[in-house]
């Protein structure tokens, strides 16, 4: 893993290399024209991993901030937190080996209230409260069956007017 302060997504980014290391020399298996990124956002930096986790797992956590605005973020609540712990593993596609990550299973112990909703959306749908009375963190699991949209997404917002948009481009597959 290599953290960059001048990445292609708007500053902070983490690039990774796959290969073999004999204790002295690293031989990179990446094709020269392929750059591999750990995350597609600009708030993933200074990744730290642990190799001695149970079951020989590789767990990573990153700093979620960006020097373009790190000093302008308010100092309360959500300033420059760490990412959720992720289990890292490699998988092969064609002639390349890639990194995948998934939230570490220990996070399941943090779950409390669960509420499931199922509905169809044609255009826009607003859900006022995900879990009434919850003022903490949310975990959202989506199963989306798309029939016609080029881009799908959702927006989370609060009473203060703060919002986060998530989008997925069906054609680009990202």
Label every model-predicted segment:
Residues 2-5, 62-64:
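Recurrent small/Gly-Pro-centered beta-turn motifs in extracellular repeat architectures
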Residues 6-9, 67-68:
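Short glycine/acidic-enriched loop and turn motifs that connect beta-strands
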Residues 22-174:
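Beta-rich accessory regions
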């Amino acid at each position: 893993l290599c953290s960059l302060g001048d990445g292609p997504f708007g500053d902070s980014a983490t690039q990774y290399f796959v290969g073999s290391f004999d204790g002295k020399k690293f031989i990179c298996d990446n094709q020269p024209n392929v750059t591999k990124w750990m995350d597609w956002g600009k708030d993933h930096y200074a990744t730290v991993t642990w190799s001695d986790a149970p079951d020989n797992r590789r767990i990573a956590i990153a700093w979620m901030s960006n020097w373009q605005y790190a000093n302008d973020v308010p100092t309360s609540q959500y300033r420059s937190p760490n990412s959720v712990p992720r289990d890292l593993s490699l998988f092969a596609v064609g002639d390349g080996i890639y990194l995948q990550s998934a939230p570490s299973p220990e996070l399941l112990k943090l779950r409390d209230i669960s509420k499931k909703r199922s509905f169809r959306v044609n255009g826009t749908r607003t859900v006022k409260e995900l879990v009434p009375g919850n003022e903490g963190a949310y975990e959202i699991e989506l199963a989306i069956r798309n029939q016609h949209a080029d881009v799908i997404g959702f927006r989370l917002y609060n009473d203060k007017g703060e919002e986060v948009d998530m989008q997925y481009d069906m054609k680009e597959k990202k």
